[in-house]
């Protein structure tokens, strides 16, 4: 896909001409930062780095901002996302929100969808080799990313550019040889995850060793001034500086953000671990999953998601409800948040059924309904998940839990009955 085109320009009351030239003009009505309060590159840099884990090299961001102001151009601020799953989750929004802050100061975001690097899979933090995705899976996931990213980013074409790294990584062998000459195997094995796997005798594929070089070449291709990423990306982001230098380009500044723990409060949020909240999930799902968060992880979520903490002394349960409402409001609206809270209270506090339950048509054979097949169809899950939930007592018919042996039930016991799958999913079954 070609990059979005557009130029910054115009004026803004209360700012000098140099600031207007460097930062552009916020669209009317947007909640933009007052540039008059950000008159110096040093104060801009301090603001942007205030909740970051690291800004590397020291003083580099302020220097980049000074250079951009002198040249009368916005910074090119890069973030790469590999479409290894169809949904952007809350963990991604920590760095997306930082990108938005750069946009609000008039800079240009370059969002790179890693359709090519996703074929390899980022090995950062991995103790094994990632499974390979098909081209169809990667393409389907990639198509959802831009729309989801706009839930956080400003879609103004003057402040936003979308690129797919397949544009430049589908390179000739001669170009690949030039890229690989920029880095040594010893450098790559300095990475903690590679070093650990190498010491343990675990396999490391050549493709995985190439991944940091491919990510670094992205910075060459888009001429990035600043790159953002999680703290698990520090090695890759710094390596990109070396690669840019080898190609005769100015080295980017690196800004790393803390990693948001998942709903378990321990591990990094990811779909693989099943502890994620997707930003397109239904309000009721968002609210309910947030309420599962351990109390000791709440402050981290409030801070990293840039949500105001409740007053000191607020009871943990009330603080968590406030957190859940704020998350749903951000990605839906206040009315949806109120409805999600009412749904949660009705189902999990008052133990009543939801106000609205969708019907699902299911099939029967010889007078029996085979639950694994019927519920898989009704809820859009796998039969193995239905069997697992049956064994765990996680399937209820009209409030009565079923067991692992309840695989085939008479039509009379199922038709018109409300089935609950897990904690928050309900359907009324209608036998065809």
Give, region by region, the residue ranges found by the protein language model.
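Intrinsically disordered, low-complexity polyampholyte segments enriched for Lys and acidic residues
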Residues: 2, 19-21
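Short, positively charged and aromatic/hydrophobic N-terminal segments
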Residues: 13, 23, 31-38
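Positively charged, low-complexity intrinsically disordered leader regions
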Residues: 36-78
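N-terminal catalytic cores of NTP/NDP-binding nucleotidyl/phosphoryl-transfer enzymes
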Residues: 61-123, 228-234, 240
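Divalent-metal (Mg2+/Mn2+/Ca2+)-assisted nucleotide/phosphate chemistry catalytic cores
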Residues: 131-256
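Conserved nucleotide- and phosphate/pyrophosphate-binding catalytic cores
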Residues: 243-432
């Amino acid at each position: 896909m070609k990059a979005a085109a557009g130029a910054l320009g115009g004026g803004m009351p209360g700012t000098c001409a140099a600031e207007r030239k460097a930062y552009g003009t916020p669209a009317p009505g947007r909640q933009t930062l007052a540039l008059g309060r950000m008159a110096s590159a040093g104060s801009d840099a301090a603001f942007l780095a205030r909740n970051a884990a690291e800004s590397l090299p020291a003083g580099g961001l302020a220097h980049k901002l000074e250079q951009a102001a002198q040249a009368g151009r916005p910074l090119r601020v890069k973030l790469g996302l590999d479409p290894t799953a169809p949904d952007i989750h809350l963990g991604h929004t920590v760095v997306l929100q930082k990108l938005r802050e750069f946009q609000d100061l008039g800079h240009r975001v370059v969002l790179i969808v890693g359709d090519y690097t996703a074929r390899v899979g980022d090995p950062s933090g991995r103790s094994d080799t990632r499974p390979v995705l098909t081209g169809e899976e990667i393409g389907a996931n990639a198509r959802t990313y831009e729309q989801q990213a706009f839930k956080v980013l400003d879609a103004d074409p003057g402040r936003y550019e979308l690129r797919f790294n397949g544009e430049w990584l589908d390179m000739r062998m001669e170009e690949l040889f030039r890229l690989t000459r920029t880095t040594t195997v010893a450098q790559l094995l300095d990475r903690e995850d590679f070093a650990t796997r190498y010491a343990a005798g675990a396999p490391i594929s050549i493709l995985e060793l190439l991944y940091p070089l491919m990510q670094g070449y992205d910075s060459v291709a888009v001429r990035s001034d600043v790159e953002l990423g999680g703290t698990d990306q520090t090695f890759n982001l710094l390596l990109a500086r070396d690669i840019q230098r080898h190609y005769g380009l100015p080295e980017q500044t690196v800004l790393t953000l803390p990693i948001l723990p998942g709903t378990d409060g321990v591990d990094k949020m990811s779909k693989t671990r099943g502890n994620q909240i997707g930003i397109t999930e239904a309000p009721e799902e968002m609210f309910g999953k947030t309420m599962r968060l351990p109390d000791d992880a709440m402050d981290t979520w409030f801070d990293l998601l840039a949500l105001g903490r409740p007053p000191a002394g607020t009871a943990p349960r009330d603080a968590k409800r406030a957190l859940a409402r704020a998350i749903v409001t951000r990605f839906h609206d206040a009315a949806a948040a109120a409805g999600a809270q009412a749904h949660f209270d009705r189902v999990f506090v008052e133990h009543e059924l939801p106000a609205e339950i969708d019907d699902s048509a299911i099939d029967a054979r010889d007078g029996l309904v085979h639950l694994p097949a019927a519920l898989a169809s009704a809820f859009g899950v796998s039969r193995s998940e239905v069997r697992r939930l049956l064994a765990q007592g996680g399937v209820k018919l009209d409030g009565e839990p079923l067991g692992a042996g309840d695989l085939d039930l008479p039509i009379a016991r199922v038709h018109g009955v409300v089935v609950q799958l897990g904690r928050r999913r309900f359907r009324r079954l209608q036998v065809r």
